[in-house]
Amino acid sequence: MARENKKELIGKVVSDKMSKTIVVEIVQRKMHPIYHKYLKVSRRVKAHDEREESKLGDKVKIIESRPISKEKRWMLVEVLEKSK
């Protein structure tokens, strides 16, 4: 069976109050189809943080994974920047 390419996203941790779970906000720029202006579109996803190494405000990289719970489909890969 061939290994699939999994999606990777970079975002900011907006909540770390759950056990082994973080909430990551991903901000993307999309162009409006009629007006051709760029809009900021953000979404929040829950990610699994096994070692609980990320804190509020950190910039992190997450990767798509199998369903871990009802809402968790992402796993933390690495912390890119620590918050100050």
Curated annotation (Swiss-Prot):
Disulfide linkage: none
Gene3D superfamilies from the UniProt entry: Nucleic acid-binding proteins (2.40.50.140)
GO biological-process terms attached to the record: translation
Claim: Ribosomal protein is one of the keywords in the record: yes
A molecular function (GO) term: rRNA binding
Keyword Flavoprotein: no
InterPro entries attached to this UniProt entry: NA-bd_OB-fold, Ribosomal_uS17, Ribosomal_uS17_bact/chlr, Ribosomal_uS17_CS
A GO CC term assigned to this protein in UniProt: cytosolic small ribosomal subunit
Top-level taxonomic group: Bacteria
PROSITE patterns linked to this entry: RIBOSOMAL_S17 (PS00056)
UniProt keywords, alphabetically: Ribonucleoprotein, Ribosomal protein, RNA-binding, rRNA-binding
Subunit structure: Part of the 30S ribosomal subunit.
General function of this protein: One of the primary rRNA binding proteins, it binds specifically to the 5'-end of 16S ribosomal RNA.
Protein family according to the UniProt entry: Belongs to the universal ribosomal protein uS17 family.
Protein name: Small ribosomal subunit protein uS17
Lineage of the species this protein comes from: Bacteria, Pseudomonadati, Spirochaetota, Spirochaetia, Spirochaetales
